[in-house]
A protein has these predicted regions:
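Pyridoxal 5′-phosphate
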Residues: 1-211
Length: 211
């Protein structure tokens, strides 16, 4: 606040999962995507504390003259409903997803693995690695078993580059970049699915170590 600059927060992994109060946090702009809280893809929201920001698309008077073009009302309504349902069940969903996350970590205790994170983390995403096991191979084997994980964030989906987040945190030469997988959880996952993942990981690693 000592500088004449606006403070923007990409809250895509927080909205619908945590209680977010932009005014209390001193946030000027906050953005989120509907699909992250189970709303329609291709629609998002922008919170602004400073309504006098310039418009990017010119032509029409839609959205208070800030973004010209016809509004996608069906998607906007779907996003609003999805956000309402997510916030209404915020605490219950958080506790349930946390139980799934803890179930995974407990189920993998007898395996050699490491957790990429700090002490402060959300339960919705686990980033774990298995020493000596290529994440590309693990990704393929899990996919063949009908289990979807990734080696990076959704922002880098489709690329062959290692996770830029892990590279920034551990260094570009870290073995973690080639060993780590990203597991995303939601309130729609079940304990049966988690148990299937745990069993499948044990089976795959047993086979790989046996090669």
């Amino acid at each position: 606040k000592d500088h004449p600059a606006a403070f923007h927060v990409d809250a895509v992994q927080a909205v619908g999962k945590l209680s977010v109060a932009p005014e209390e946090l001193g946030i000027d702009f906050l953005t989120a995507s509907a699909h992250k809280f189970h709303g329609p893809k291709g629609v998002g929201l922008l919170y602004t504390r400073k309504p006098d920001f310039f418009n990017l698309l010119h032509g029409g008077d839609q959205e208070d003259k800030r973004r010209a073009s016809t509004e996608n009302l069906i998607s906007i309504a779907g996003m609003a409903q999805a956000l309402k349902e997510a916030t209404d069940q915020l605490d219950a969903n958080y506790q349930y997803i946390q139980s799934l996350s803890e179930r995974i970590l407990t189920g993998l205790e007898d395996l050699d693995f490491y957790l990429n994170c700090t002490d402060s983390k959300l339960p919705h995403v686990l980033n774990i690695g298995f020493p000596g096991i290529s994440n590309d191979i693990l990704l393929l084997r899990l996919d063949m078993a009908g289990i979807s994980v990734s080696t990076g964030s959704a922002c880098t989906a489709g690329t062959v580059q290692p996770s830029h987040v892990l590279a920034a945190y551990y260094g570009e030469d870290s073995h973690r970049l080639k060993e780590s997988i990203r597991i995303s959880l939601s309130e729609f996952n079940t304990t049966a699915e988690v148990d299937t993942f745990i069993t499948t990981i044990h089976k795959i690693l047993g086979e790989l170590h046996g090669i």
